[in-house]
Amino acid sequence: MIAVLKTPLSNHIKANTKALFSSLPKTKNELEISLDDLAKQIISGYRLSREEAIILTQIAGEEDILLLCEAADRVRQACCGNVVDLCSIINVKSGGCSENCSFCSQSVHHPGEDSPIYGLKSTEEILDQAKAAEAAGAKRFCLVSQGRGVKYNSPKSTEFEQILGTVRQILAETNIKPCCALGELTPEQAQALAEAGVTRYNHNLEASEHFYPEIVSTHSWNDRVETVKNLKAAGIQACTGGIIGMGETWADRIDLALALRELEVESVPLNLLNSREGTPLGGLLKLDPYDALKAIAIFRLILPKQIIRYAGGREAVMGDLQALGLKAGINAMLIGHYLTTLGQPPEKDQAMLKSLGLQGGETPIATNGL
């Protein structure tokens, strides 16, 4: 069991790490020593402050960023092990969404050409996809629906009841664990999902509270937080993360990670923006893969015990550097296709894991606090 530090950092942390947070070391060797010491402190239970995390964002240059990744990877190994949590998703209802999320091609405010429009898929079709995901190695299968939330749908009860029935059918006919991402939930809906057998629910914060109004105006960041609290109160694990590369600052990224830590979410999907033509963010330059690696590493240092998941955009942004993310703090992957874009074949992902000495499976949640 990891010991939790009871007294301030100044009473524990070594001189090398103190130096890291007073000014960044000038040589590669000094930086490596300082980051190694920081990793040891985090493994022992130290929690990074906002100011310390922002200092880490000043690390620049490919070689130094890779040193940061190595430190994060040591934390990942010590706190999470070498099993990579594999999941898959299905878009059970697509297009025509009332919300104006700037990154999403399913919005009625800016529909993308690559976004199909269809109603809720049948239980049989969803079940077939669940079986295919299980055969590909996924341990969880998430039913994702467009829209602000099922509580806003009309007729309100029919679709939600169908989803509950589909969840029960998946549990009866497969060994894969069904998850859901249906938008905002009332406490009663969260409880109904828990009773049907849903143990994890995806509802991303997407960005920091400060940056959120820049990308969405039809609902608030606090609306999202409320749903996360509702599902956790029902005993459902929170799969809650965000998107990197929407024009946010490094401080915004740190604030998102800290908010996730405060909410004690269990799983953190990190999407790397793969901008879609026709959306307000369609013209943004692609995120630099080394900035993505730096973000992944800092998220791991802030969230040492959480499942941190490669989600949408990893192929488009990381390209041939995808494997480096798995050595920078990532310990989970979404395999197969995404909501409106294609992913790489699961066999390629499995081969990548094997080449890194990692094993696909299901990562247990930390039982001694997040």
Swiss-Prot record:
Catalytic activity annotation: (4R,5S)-dethiobiotin + (sulfur carrier)-SH + 2 reduced [2Fe-2S]-[ferredoxin] + 2 S-adenosyl-L-methionine = (sulfur carrier)-H + biotin + 2 5'-deoxyadenosine + 2 L-methionine + 2 oxidized [2Fe-2S]-[ferredoxin]
Keyword Cell membrane (UniProt): no
Associated pathway: Cofactor biosynthesis; biotin biosynthesis; biotin from 7,8-diaminononanoate: step 2/2
EC number: 2.8.1.6
PROSITE patterns named among the record's database cross-references: RADICAL_SAM
Cofactor requirement: [4Fe-4S] cluster; [2Fe-2S] cluster
MF (Gene Ontology): 2 iron, 2 sulfur cluster binding; 4 iron, 4 sulfur cluster binding; biotin synthase activity; iron ion binding
Key words, A-Z: 2Fe-2S, 4Fe-4S, Biotin biosynthesis, Iron, Iron-sulfur, Metal-binding, S-adenosyl-L-methionine, Transferase
Cofactor note: Binds 1 [4Fe-4S] cluster. The cluster is coordinated with 3 cysteines and an exchangeable S-adenosyl-L-methionine.
Residues annotated for [4Fe-4S] cluster binding in this entry: 97, 101, 104
Domain Radical SAM core stretches: 79-314
Biological role: Catalyzes the conversion of dethiobiotin (DTB) to biotin by the insertion of a sulfur atom into dethiobiotin via a radical-based mechanism.
Subunit architecture: Homodimer.
Matching HAMAP family: BioB
Family listed: Belongs to the radical SAM superfamily. Biotin synthase family.
Protein name: Biotin synthase
Organism: Trichodesmium erythraeum (strain IMS101)
Gene name tied to this protein: bioB
